[in-house]
Swiss-Prot record:
Entry GO CC: cytoplasm
EC number: 2.1.1.72
Example of a GO MF term: site-specific DNA-methyltransferase (adenine-specific) activity
Gene, per the UniProt record: ccrM
Identification of the protein by name: DNA methyltransferase CcrM
Taxonomic path: Bacteria, Pseudomonadati, Pseudomonadota, Alphaproteobacteria, Hyphomicrobiales
Function summary: A beta subtype methylase that recognizes the double-stranded sequence 5'-GANTC-3' and methylates A-2 on both strands. CcrM-mediated methylation has important cellular functions. Contributes to the accurate cell-cycle control of DNA replication and cellular morphology.
Pfam families: N6_N4_Mtase, RAMA
Enzyme class: transferase
């Protein structure tokens, strides 16, 4: 099944690859929280649904064990009664017991507890996505910042087919808000597949407003009576974009409010691991059947375009240590206007000054900055080649070694 079957954009195949792997899923996806030890090893819960309360179930996961979190917490809608259409038919709204809290203070305490537990299990370079409506997302955002998470973006999910405002007393509520945050301000190494998102968006930067329909049709899970299995089932395309943007094949995706299993189904299809937490048995049953029916995509279909920033860093000394350049080699720019000599310590010298390939490249041109990898060239069989070609050789060796 092609990724475009439920993505509104195509995955662009690039020449730089993120390693993929074949993931084996357990025959039984369900684990009981109380039967797992505190901070259980990864093998005890990976690619499974943990049945239990969100916070207590999170205690079963070890520190820094997940790469990305997607959380769709209770909205705390405060409906105050049934909703009816103009024809007096009742609107299927969220009125389940799990969405009811006695006060804002109780909701804030609940939010703080699960966010603290999530922060413990999130890797230092991991990120968290939280989705909500105007009823709860601002309260959740406050807790995120108070606990030290660092906000990266807020994303507006614009719904192509939102529910009307039947009473005509407010604007039609046509969007939900996602908050994307790193574990803390120091979390600089988080995954963001910028080039893949740009390529998927007709080579234009992906914006922070996303247009998707709400979950309908054959994707919407129904019970034997034709009723919705879960009132807030999210579209697979939304989860797919999140995972394609902020994770790599083989990463672990945590969903502490698993519901009908959209996160697990998309993770399996996209070659990611998952762990879900859910306490309601009907949702667990639906999610289990759904995930078991998913066929993962192949490695070629999961190739993600990456850019220079996503590639492993290579020091200039590594080029010398590999024997690709020797001390005393003369480098020049592509027009042979400037020259510098390679020294044994990995620096260059030119005009009586020594420094890095970048610093000396800038100095000889009278610039403040320079990319030495593309500026400096070496000569091979009478042909000038950028030293970046040597860096590429090192990166290929690193990839072959699994680095």
């Amino acid at each position: 099944m092609a990724l475009t079957a439920y993505l509104p954009y195509a995955v662009t195949i690039g020449t730089s690859f993120l390693r993929s792997q074949v993931i084996e899923y357990p025959m039984s996806l369900v684990r009981l929280a109380h039967e797992l030890p505190i901070e259980a090893p990864r093998t005890a819960w990976l690619d499974s649904i943990i049945k239990g309360d969100c916070v207590s179930a999170l205690e079963r996961l070890s520190d820094h064990s997940v790469d990305v979190i997607f959380a769709d917490p209770p909205y705390n809608l405060q409906l105050g009664g049934d909703l009816h259409r103009p024809d007096q038919s009742m609107v299927s709204a969220v009125d389940d017991h799990w969405d009811q809290f006695e006060s804002f203070q109780a909701y804030d305490a609940f939010t703080r507890a699960w966010l603290l537990a999530c922060r413990r299990v999130l890797k230092p370079n991991g990120t968290i996505w939280v989705i909500g409506s105007y009823h709860n997302i601002f309260r959740v955002g406050t807790q995120l910042q108070d606990l030290g998470f660092w906000l990266l973006n807020d994303i507006v999910w614009r719904k192509t087919n939102p529910m009307p405002n039947f009473r005509g007393r407010r604007f039609q509520n046509a969007h939900e808000t996602l908050i994307w945050a790193s574990r803390d301000q120091k979390g600089k190494g988080y995954t963001f597949n910028y080039e893949a998102m740009k390529a998927a968006n007709d080579d234009v930067q992906m914006r922070s407003d996303w247009l998707f329909p709400i979950c309908t049709g054959s994707e919407r899970l129904k019970d034997e009576n034709g009723d919705k299995v879960h009132p807030t089932q999210k579209p697979e395309a939304l989860l797919a974009r999140i995972m394609m943007a902020s994770s790599k094949p083989g990463d672990v995706i945590l969903d502490p409010f698993f519901g009908s299993g959209t996160t697990g189904a998309v993770a399996k299809r996209l070659g990611r691991h998952f762990v879900g937490i859910e306490r309601e048995q009907p949702y667990i049953d639906a999610a289990t059947a759904r995930i078991n029916a998913v066929e993962p995509l192949g490695k070629a279909e999961l190739t993600v375009m990456t850019g220079k920033r996503a590639e492993p860093r290579v020091a200039f000394t590594s080029v010398m240590e590999a024997g690709l350049l020797r001390p005393g080699t003369v480098l020049c720019d592509e027009r042979r206007r400037f020259a510098a000599i390679v020294r044994a310590d990995g620096t260059l010298t030119a005009n009586g000054e020594a420094g890095s390939i970048h610093r000396i490249g800038a100095r000889v041109q009278g610039f403040d900055a320079c990319n030495g990898w593309t500026f400096w060239h070496f000569e091979e069989n009478g042909v000038l080649k950028p030293i970046d070609a040597l860096r590429k050789i090192i990166r290929e060796q690193m990839a072959a070694a699994g680095a």
